[in-house]
Each structure stands twice: as C-alpha cells, then as structure tokens.
UniProtKB/Swiss-Prot annotation:
<feature type="topological domain" description="Cytoplasmic">
    <location>
        <begin position="1"/>
        <end position="35"/>
    </location>
</feature>
<feature type="transmembrane region" description="Helical">
    <location>
        <begin position="469"/>
        <end position="489"/>
    </location>
</feature>
<feature type="topological domain" description="Cytoplasmic">
    <location>
        <begin position="97"/>
        <end position="121"/>
    </location>
</feature>
<feature type="transmembrane region" description="Helical">
    <location>
        <begin position="234"/>
        <end position="254"/>
    </location>
</feature>
<dbReference type="GO" id="GO:0005452">
    <property type="term" value="F:solute:inorganic anion antiporter activity"/>
</dbReference>
<feature type="transmembrane region" description="Helical">
    <location>
        <begin position="76"/>
        <end position="96"/>
    </location>
</feature>
<dbReference type="InterPro" id="IPR011531">
    <property type="entry name" value="HCO3_transpt-like_TM_dom"/>
</dbReference>
<feature type="topological domain" description="Cytoplasmic">
    <location>
        <begin position="352"/>
        <end position="468"/>
    </location>
</feature>
<feature type="transmembrane region" description="Helical">
    <location>
        <begin position="122"/>
        <end position="142"/>
    </location>
</feature>
<dbReference type="Pfam" id="PF00955">
    <property type="entry name" value="HCO3_cotransp"/>
</dbReference>
<comment type="function">
    <text>Putative boron transporter. Boron is essential for maintaining the integrity of plants cell walls.</text>
</comment>
<keyword id="KW-0813">Transport</keyword>
<keyword id="KW-1133">Transmembrane helix</keyword>
<feature type="transmembrane region" description="Helical">
    <location>
        <begin position="198"/>
        <end position="218"/>
    </location>
</feature>
<feature type="transmembrane region" description="Helical">
    <location>
        <begin position="290"/>
        <end position="310"/>
    </location>
</feature>
<feature type="transmembrane region" description="Helical">
    <location>
        <begin position="161"/>
        <end position="181"/>
    </location>
</feature>
<dbReference type="GO" id="GO:0016020">
    <property type="term" value="C:membrane"/>
</dbReference>
Length: 673
C-alpha cells in the first residue's frame, strides 16, 4: 500500500486499481461453476453461527430492542453491499462482539437518561452511527490507512484476548441465568418454580458443555486417523453446525412431563411482526432526540470509528496475507469509505452496523485457495499426461503446462508467471536428465505439479454475495431458530473463546510462566513459537507481565457502568506506547521477535512417521506402485495441510527448522536464561 499524501488520493488509487479487475471478479466465479458453492456454504456457516449468538446476546443486553433478526439483517445487507461495491471481495463483514459491546453501553446510557429512555434508544444510536460514518469517511479521505503498519501483534492479541474473556464472561452469565427467573417474566409461573429452574439449569450445563466438547473435537476432524477423507473433510468444515443441530435435537429428548419452557429456547419475533417492522422506520424518531444528545453522540462515535477502523483494517490484512499470493490490488482506503456508508445505512434503519470480521475473512480466502489450486492442478496434470502420451519432450511438456497456468491466471498483472513457475520448470527439465534431486527419476505429473504449483486464490465476488444472501434468508427461518436452546449458544460462546486461543502468542507466553525450569525442554521438543529459542526467558517474562497488566486495565475499563464505552481508548494509547516507550524498555531485536507482524513457528520434532505410510523406501521395498500411493485415502490434501499451518484466527504460520543445532546445549541455556 503506497503512502498517498493528498486527500482522496488513497480512495482514488484503490478505486482505479479495483475497477480494472472488477469484471474479472465476476467471471472468475462463473468459470468455477458449481464448485464455487463449496466455499460459499463453508463461509456462510462460519458467518451465520456467530451472528446468531451475538444477536441473542444483544437481545438480552438491550431488553429486546435489538436481536437476532436485526443482526442477521445487518450482516446480510452489509455483506451484499460490500460484495458488489466494496474493494476487497474476500473480506467478510458481519455483526461482531465489539458492536455488541458498544450497543450495550449505548443502551445503558440511554436508559439512564429520562430525555432518551428505551423509546429513543435506537434513534440516539442512529445519531451515533451518523457521526461514526462521518469519521470513517474522513479517515478514508485523509488516507489514514497508511498507519496500518503500526497495528502490531501486541495490540491485536490483547484485543483478541479481551474478546475471548468477554465471550467466557457472557457464557458464564448465560449459564447462571438459566437457574434464575428472566427479568421481564412473571416469577409466579409454574416453569419458574425452584425445581424446574434447577432442572433447566442442569440441562443447560449438559447442553452447553456437550456442544463445547464435541465442537472442539470436530474442529480438527481433518487430522483424525479414522474415517474416509471426504467424511473427515465434511466434519471439519461443518462440524460446528452439525453439533449445534445435534444438541438442539437432544434437547427434545427430555421427559414430556416437564413444563413448557424447560429447557429454555430462543425467543425472537417473526420478521413481519409489528415489533420487528419498527426498526425500518426508526429514522422518523431521530428528529425527536434533543440537540444536546445529538452532539453528545459524537463521543461514543469516536470510540466506535476507531474500533471499526482497527478491526476492519486488521481483517482485511488477514484476508490478504502475502502467503496467499493474491494478484489483485488492495483497497484499504476505499473499503473504509464503504464501511462508513454501510454504518450510516444501518444507523438510519435501526440496525447494528457490520464491519470486517476475524477469522471469517482469512477462512474465506483459505477456502478459495484450496479450490483454485485443485482446479489448476487438475488441468495441468491432464495437459502433462496428454503430452506424455504424444511422447513430447520435457521442454514441450513444461511449455504446455505453463500455457494452462497462464490461461487460468485471471489477474491483469500476470507478468510474474514465469518466475513463479521456476521451481516446477527446474523439476520438469531435470527429470530424466540426471540433475539434482530428480536424478534417475521419471517426470510424474501428479507428484511434481503438487510439489511445485504456487498458491493461487480464486479472487471473485460471487461466494461473498451468495453467503450474504443466505444469511438474509435465515431471517425467514425464525420458526427453526426458535428450536435452538439458549444453553447451546452459551456453549458456542465458550467454543469461540477456547478456539481463538491457539496461535495467540500472549496466551502461549502466559502458559510458559507456569512451566518449571526442569520441564521447559518439553516446549522445545514440539512445535513452538520462534521467540522461545531467540529471546531470553527473562525478557519473555517481563514482556508478558507488561501485556498482562495492560490487559487487566483494558478489561477493568469494560466494568465501568457508562464510562465502559471508552474501552477502545487503551488500545489507541498502546500504539503510541509500542512506538515510543517499549523501544526503550526492551532490546529492539527481542521486541521485534515478540511483537512481530507474522506468526513464526519452529519445528522441534518430526510430525509424521513415514513407517506407517506407503512412501519412500518402504514403498520400494514392497514394490507398491506409485499410483496406489497417489490414490490412497491416507494422503494429505490441501485443506488438511492448510489447517496445520494456520492459526485459529486464520493467520498463516511461518514454519522453520530450529535455529540451534545442539538441542541439549540450547535446553541448558534456555533453562538458566
């Protein structure tokens, strides 16, 4: 991203860059045919489930002024706008936890002011959105995205940890609430007698922990040693939804003599009911908000604008990691401008705004990377085999494969194709020529193309558009959503919290504090973050304690009744602290590793034992044909490999060998550092 200096320069550059590939963004999806439906369904489920959970949380915190239907409507509307008019179509938008937190504080403030109250809550929130939209557009016009490089790992991981703790907090509050009488209900009803409340609470514990355990297990289904590959892949992609359906079905197996309302289920009005239709006309009440509160709305708008700017840019960064090898240009400035427009529309319609979300955005890119590689690999293998039947030379085979690659390269900037295929060319040309590692080996299209084909992503807009439409159609499925027990959602909140921890180096360093010196070698034996081998233990401890203290400050701010709306402020301050203060407290080289922009992982021990696979010397000793190995269900495939090298937030790991050859000496130094 170029550092544009003049106003509107970033937006203009982004718009012109994306305009050149806009037509191809649509054609690329149509060329994929029905295969585009697989990543569409995958990202639809990954996007819809959190929105349903957040919608239920929003409903409880705002006395049902907003809820699941409004959250789904916002996600669908903003998703459609962004997929059609946005700059980066791989970026997924939706209602996220920061929006829920801010709208909760707005509701608390509105209820405490008689001039506003519950009646004008959405109208005042609309004014907050108007100011937020103005600020976001100004940030885009003034090229504020040029500072995106200052969003380092420490801020992102602290924010992620805060959201994780708030998820767990919400799950605990929800479970405790299952034993209590809801605030808006009549406590004299039979369903709220002690024995039935206790029964409902125990069932809630079973359902929530049941979903948590099974969802976490299904999350890593691709690495299971049981089942066929297609089955493992299906469970890995859609396991969370399957578990939600499974535990919702289990909730109907309770004895029939339980009163209605045990277990408790989602309560949401039909989209055509009068209380739902009110949101579309909230703009009429905005004129009733006193002028003083219209001006006061600017204060929370500053916090929300900064929060959206940070979250949206980081989500876009994660969706466009350089390892994905994207060819179309970025559009940070333009997308922030579009975000401002979407926030304005949502505010006027009485909906909670949507912004870029993690991990859905990098998950979307990852699913399209697998699809594109499968398509390229299939066509290139077919062309290579066709040439081999014609007894073409190796140079002719490579030339034909390169033509296929160029033909499928949809980007207008396909000038580096030859350079990207250098490794494949070398492998093809050296085969049968007695050179390098391929000495004495015949060129095998299946093996060589798989090993040397560069990563490609099917950059298009259709999957984002279709998943947004599907999210919108969920609003019509209210009768089905009402069948979900609320306790299952508390389990899903806990699942989102636990699943977000792996790959968070702040969490990894916290665990390191509780490992005794004599057992630290266990960390080095497995896969571990690079800082473990590079940074002295004392520096790791000091940096972690600073981060822990700052996290407690951020979390403490969220407990301030009305002032909690300022919770994004510490994260803005942290950017300055990182740039000017931490540089003096820590060795710059150590700080660069601890706060690096990329996740680097060291290989401490072999991950797989080839003695259980049909490969290498074992295959040759038993005279097993190569075709048997290639068609074996036990081989690793693209999606499984991407799962292994991706953190839970969608961040690609840089995996390298240990920087120390003498392991025993390294352990000794590490234990005494």
């Amino acid at each position: 991203m170029e550092g544009v200096k003049f106003p509107f320069g970033g937006i203009i550059n982004d718009f012109n860059g994306r305009r050149k590939c806009y037509k191809q963004d649509w054609l690329a999806a149509f060329n994929s045919g029905v295969r585009i439906l697989a990543p569409t369904l995958y990202i639809f489920i990954a996007s819809a489930l959190p929105v349903i959970a957040f919608g239920e949380q929003l409903s409880r915190e705002t006395d049902r002024s907003l809820g699941i239907a409004e959250s789904l409507a916002s996600t669908a509307l903003c998703g459609i706008i962004h997929s059609v008019f946005g700059g980066q179509p791989l970026l997924i938008v939706g209602v996220a936890e920061p929006t829920i937190i801010m709208y909760t504080y707005l509701h608390s403030f509105s209820k405490s002011r008689p001039e506003l109250g519950q009646k004008l809550y959405l109208a005042w929130a609309g004014w907050v959105c108007v100011w937020t939209a103005v600020l976001l557009m100004l940030l885009a016009m003034l090229n504020a995205c040029n500072i995106i490089s200052r969003f380092t790992r420490i801020a992102g991981e602290l924010f992620g940890m805060l959201i994780t703790v708030l998820f767990i907090q919400e799950a605990v509050k929800g479970l405790i609430g299952e034993f209590l009488v809801p605030k808006s209900d009549d406590p004299s009803l039979e369903v709220y007698q002690f024995q039935w409340r206790y029964t409902n609470g125990l069932l809630a514990v079973i359902f929530s922990f049941g979903l948590l355990y099974t969802a976490l297990k299904s999350r890593r289904a691709r690495s299971w040693k049981y089942g066929f590959r297609w089955m493992r892949g299906f469970i890995g992609d859609y396991g969370t939804l399957l578990m939600l359906v499974l535990w919702s079905a289990f909730s109907y197996t309770v004895p029939r003599n339980l009163p209605e309302g045990v277990p408790r289920r989602l309560e949401l009005p039909l989209p055509w009911a009068s209380e739902s239709l009110y949101h579309w006309t909230v703009v009429k009440d905005m004129a009733k908000v006193p002028p003083l509160y219209i001006l006061a709305a600017f204060i929370p708008a500053i916090m929300i604008a900064g929060l959206y700017f940070f979250d949206h840019c980081v989500s876009a960064q994660m969706a466009q990691q350089k390892e994905f090898n994207l060819k179309n240009p970025t559009a940070y400035h333009y997308d922030i401008f579009i975000l401002g427009i979407m926030t304005l529309i949502c505010g006027l319609l009485g909906l909670p705004p949507s912004n870029g979300v993690i991990p859905q955005s990098p998950m979307h890119t990852k699913s399209l990377a697998v699809l594109k590689k499968q398509q390229m690999r299939k066509k290139m293998v077919q062309k290579a085999k066709e040439c081999m039947r014609e007894k073409a030379s190796n140079s002719e085979i490579y030339g034909r494969m390169q033509d296929v690659f160029i033909e499928m390269e949809t980007s207008p900037k396909a000038t580096s194709v030859v350079k990207e295929l250098e490794n494949l060319k070398e492998a093809v040309m050296k085969a049968d020529d007695g050179g390098g590692e391929t000495k004495g080996k015949k060129f095998d299209p299946e093996v060589h193309i798989e090993d040397h084909l560069p990563v490609r992503v099917n950059e298009q807009r259709v999957s984002n558009l279709l998943q947004s439409v599907l999210v919108g159609l969920l609003i019509l499925a209210v009768p089905v959503l009402r069948m979900i027990p609320t306790s299952v959602l508390w389990g899903y909140f806990t699942y989102m919290a636990v699943d977000s921890l792996p790959g968070n180096q702040f969490w990894e360093r916290l665990q390191l504090l509780f490992i005794t010196p004599g057992r630290r070698f266990k960390v080095l034996e497995g896969l571990h973050a690079s800082f473990v081998e590079i940074v002295p233990y004392k520096s790791i401890v000091m940096f972690t304690l600073f981060q822990l203290l700052y996290f407690l400050i951020c979390y403490g701010v969220t407990w301030i009744p009305v002032g909690g709306i300022l919770f994004p402020l510490p994260f803005f301050i942290l950017i300055a602290l990182r740039q000017y203060i931490l540089q003096r407290l820590f060795d710059p080289s150590h700080l660069q590793v601890l706060d690096s922009s990329e996740y680097e992982e060291m290989v401490g021990a072999p991950q797989r034992n080839s003695s259980f696979g049909f490969n290498g010397e074992l295959r040759e000793a038993h005279n097993i044909p190569l075709s048997v190995v290639e068609n074996s269900e036990d081989e690793f495939y693209d999606a499984e490999i991407l799962d292994e090298i991706t953190t839970s937030r969608g961040e690609l790991k840089h995996r390298t060998l240990s920087v120390k050859e003498d392991r025993s000496q390294m352990v000794k130094i590490y234990n005494h550092s």
